[in-house]
Each structure stands twice: as C-alpha cells, then as structure tokens.
C-alpha cells in the first residue's frame, strides 16, 4: 500500500465511519484514505457548512448527516436534501450504550420525510426489537443496535430477529 495506513480489508469490506469530531470538514479526505466507504457527520460539529459541502461532494463518497434528539432538523433542510441518508440519535447522551429510546425521534422522522421524500433514515441508540418494529412501521430504513445485540446470549439470533422485522 506504499506506506498508506488503511483499515484492514477495506478493499473488501465497506466501513462506515461515525465522525464524532469537531470541524470534520477539515479532515474528510483523511477518513476516505483510511478506508471509509461511508461517513456519518454530526450536524452540530460542522463549523463551516459551505466548506463542508465542497469537501464532501468532492470525495464522491456516501455520507449522512446525524442529529441529536434535541436538534431541530427543520433548520438543516439544505444538508438533509444533499445527504445520502440521515441518522437520528435515539438517545441524548451519545456514546453510551444501554440507554432508553427517546420518543422525540418519532417527530424527527416525520420532519425528515417532509423535507426529503424517500430519504434513507437510520436511528442509532435505544434500539430494541420493539422500538425497531415501531420505527420500521413509520418508514425508518436502518437501525443501529449495540447493547441488545452484543449483550444477547446469542448475538447471531438477535441479528436475525432484527432482520425479520424488516420483512414484516
């Protein structure tokens, strides 16, 4: 790889990097070089929206914009329109597993659907089989669940249970 540092098997595995960093627009190219095929950028972390859009579109990489439950997604409609997907945080304290799902996300989902019809919407945090089913019914296309899967006696069965929800 000529001295380049990349995540293992990035030529075969699609890696999603969830950038929980300030001013990500200054380093986006670095994450692609590390092997990311998809980036999640938290709206609150962007310092310069114009520079961010210039940099992210130049990379020709799949990207999504993430929002906390306290964010007013309607204020970010321009970014939502341009993003490949939207990720909503189902919890307020980002980075801590095992938290209770925040129902404010349900309103955010509806607002996203009004801003961008057919949007790919992901929810990360507070996800269990019940909340995943509820979210699927209102149009959420992806869920991210850590503690329910990794805390299960058999994580493979837990993953299959989540997959079955998408077939309902």
Feature roles, as predicted:
Residues 39-48, 87-97, 138-159:
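Glycine-rich phosphate-binding active-site loops on the catalytic face of alpha/beta enzymes
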Residues 2-6, 28, 49-53, 73-76, ...:
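Generic structural signal for well-ordered alpha-helices
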Residues 69, 77-110, 114-116, 154-161:
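Glycine/Thr-rich beta-alpha phosphate-binding loop at enzyme active sites
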Residues 1-55:
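N-terminal active-site wall of soluble small-molecule enzyme domains
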């Amino acid at each position: 790889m000529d001295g380049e540092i990349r995540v293992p098997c990035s030529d075969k595995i699609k890696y999603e990097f969830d950038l929980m960093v300030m001013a990500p627009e200054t380093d986006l190219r670095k994450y692609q070089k590390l092997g990311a095929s998809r980036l999640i950028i938290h709206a609150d972390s962007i310092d310069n929206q114009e520079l961010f859009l210039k940099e992210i579109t130049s990379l020709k990489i799949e990207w999504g914009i993430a929002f906390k439950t306290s964010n007013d997604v309607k204020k970010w409609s321009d970014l939502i329109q341009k993003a490949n997907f939207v990720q909503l945080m189902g919890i307020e304290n980002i980075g801590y597993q095992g938290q209770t799902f925040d129902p404010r996300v349900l309103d955010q989902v509806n607002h996203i659907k009004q801003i961008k019809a057919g949007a790919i919407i992901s929810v990360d945090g507070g996800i269990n089989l019940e909340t995943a089913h509820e979210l699927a019914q209102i149009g959420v296309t992806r869920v991210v669940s850590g503690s329910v899967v990794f805390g299960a006696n058999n994580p493979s069965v837990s993953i299959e249970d989540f997959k079955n929800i998408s077939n309902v």
